[in-house]
């Protein structure tokens, strides 16, 4: 098997030339992408829209690519949302010649879905430095950069170490609740207990740093009910908005209130717990007293458990409303929630950081003692924006980073 990261299309020079030499002969950004199988693969998957719920097309492309590189590919069906693609699937793959046959020691995983809207692939040339060529479009960072870099890191590793026990897992639905990873995790055939792997490497945009952990998550609506009436005679009704506002004001400040005074906990590692009231829906018209109001809340937990946070929030709502039973938190509306996730950072040569965003890490059940790493190219600060973009240099560095994590895991296994 040729080395996928270093094998470039012929451009009239000897095959012994270095990748840097070959790329320097390309005259445009498009030529550079075309000349690199790795960058071309990244381009190809970004060009396929895969907004959560509609991942089948990109999944098919990735699966066929892996099969063409002598991987055994298992397509695990994942239930669809009410308006989603009923044929979507997770991809679990491993080298067909692997001695572990579906029980890899080392698992690399990321997700193939993206947030909306689809933004076409674009290139922004840098005549002075090929590494600074900017690649824009939805998924260029989150998380198709990780998908591409993980695949090519594995292919490169297998060329030098054909018996390395490696597996790849690419899931759907990460951006909207993690159903893809939970479906894989709950499958006792694909994810048996105890875990067959000793290392899991998760791919998300971390700016090429190893992540020591990320905050926990709790989502829920706060609901208020009232009585509709003509706005000229508001005393004939009961405003759900007026009832909801004191609760929202209190909940919105819980991350700033000391825990001893009824606030949400902080930690030295993750800082403050943060509260975001992301959406409010209420009423039907300005001249009607609103009979209902609902606010969607997301809390990023710096410490404690979801159950502990629920108790704090519920108490705050009761106190703010004087115990009004018409204002309440519907914690059953969203399943799960999770505590802060502590991760491994024991591989030298990386910057180490923490992040505030959520990942599929808590959705994958693993045995105690399994190493979990979170690493990937690009910045979360552009990942969901209309300016989502990544450089060629960041992509290429991520391949090296994933290979370094793989090699550390291989060497650790040899020592045990």
From Swiss-Prot:
Note whether Phosphoprotein occurs among the keywords.
no
Mind naming one GO cellular-component term on file for this protein?
extracellular region
Q: Which family does it belong to?
A: Belongs to the peptidase M20A family.
Q: Which cofactor does it need?
A: Zn(2+)
Q: Which residues are sugar-modified?
A: 54, 70, 129, 187, 319
**Localisation per UniProt entry:** Secreted
User: Which InterPro entries does the UniProt record give?
Assistant: ArgE/DapE_CS, Bact_exopeptidase_dim_dom, Peptidase_M20, Peptidase_M20_dimer, Peptidase_M20A
Q: What class of enzyme is it?
A: hydrolase
Catalytic positions are: 174 (proton acceptor)
**EC number per UniProt:** 3.4.17.-
User: Where on this chain does Zn(2+) 2 bind?
Assistant: 142
Cofactor, how bound (note): Binds 2 Zn(2+) ions per subunit.
Q: What is its main location?
A: secreted
* PROSITE patterns with a match to the protein in the record: ARGE_DAPE_CPG2_1, ARGE_DAPE_CPG2_2
Q: Which cysteines are joined by disulfide bonds?
A: none
Q: Which Pfam families match?
A: M20_dimer, Peptidase_M20
As given in the record, the signal peptide range reads: 1-16
What's this protein's name?
A: Probable carboxypeptidase An18g06210
One Gene Ontology term from the biological process aspect of the record: proteolysis
GO MF annotations in UniProt: metal ion binding; peptidase activity
Residues the entry annotates as binding Zn(2+) 1:
142, 175
Alphabetized PANTHER family for the sequence: ACETYLORNITHINE DEACETYLASE, PEPTIDASE M20 DIMERISATION DOMAIN-CONTAINING PROTEIN
């Amino acid at each position: 098997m040729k080395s996928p990261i270093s094998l470039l299309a012929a451009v009239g020079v000897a095959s012994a030339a270095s990748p840097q030499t070959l790329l320097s002969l390309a005259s445009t950004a498009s030529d550079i992408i075309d000349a690199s199988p790795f960058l071309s693969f990244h381009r190809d998957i970004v060009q396929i829209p895969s907004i959560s719920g509609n991942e089948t097309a990109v999944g098919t492309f990735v699966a066929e690519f892996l099969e063409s590189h002598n991987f055994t590919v298992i397509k695990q069906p994942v239930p669809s949302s009410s308006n989603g693609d009923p044929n979507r699937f997770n991809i679990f793959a491993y080298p067909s010649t692997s001695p572990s046959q579906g029980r890899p020691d080392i698992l690399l995983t990321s997700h193939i879905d993206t947030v909306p809207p689809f933004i076409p692939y674009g290139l922004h040339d840098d005549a002075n430095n090929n590494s600074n060529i900017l690649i824009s479009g939805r998924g260029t960072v989150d998380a198709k950069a990780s998908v591409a870099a993980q695949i090519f890191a594995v292919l490169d590793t297998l060329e030098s170490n054909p018996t390395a026990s490696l597996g790849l897992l690419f899931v759907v639905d990460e951006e909207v609740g993690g159903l893809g990873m939970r479906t894989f995790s709950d499958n006792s055939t694909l994810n048996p207990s105890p875990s067959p792997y000793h290392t899991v490497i998760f791919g998300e945009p971390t700016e090429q740093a190893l992540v020591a952990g990320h905050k926990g998550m709790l989502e829920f609506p706060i609901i208020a009910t009232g009585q509709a009436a003509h706005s000229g005679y508001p005393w004939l009704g009961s405003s759900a908005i007026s009832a909801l506002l004191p609760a929202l004001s209190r909940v919105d400040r819980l991350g700033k209130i000391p825990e001893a005074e009824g606030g949400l906990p902080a930690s030295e590692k993750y800082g403050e717990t943060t509260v975001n009231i992301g959406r409010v829906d209420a009423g039907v018209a300005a001249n009607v007293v609103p009979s209902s109001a609902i606010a969607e809340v997301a809390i990023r937990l710096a410490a404690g458990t979801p159950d502990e946070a629920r108790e704090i929030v519920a108490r705050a709502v009761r106190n703010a409303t004087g115990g009004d039973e018409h204002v309440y938190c519907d914690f059953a509306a969203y399943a799960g929630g999770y505590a802060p996730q502590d991760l491994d950072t024991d591989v030298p040569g990386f910057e180490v950081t923490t992040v505030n965003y959520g990942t599929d890490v808590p959705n994958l059940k693993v045995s105690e003692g399994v190493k979990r790493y979170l690493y990937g190219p690009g910045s979360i600060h552009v990942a969901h924006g209309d300016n989502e973009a990544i450089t060629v240099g960041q992509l290429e560095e991520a391949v090296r980073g994933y290979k370094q994590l793989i090699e550390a895991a291989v060497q650790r296994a040899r020592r045990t």
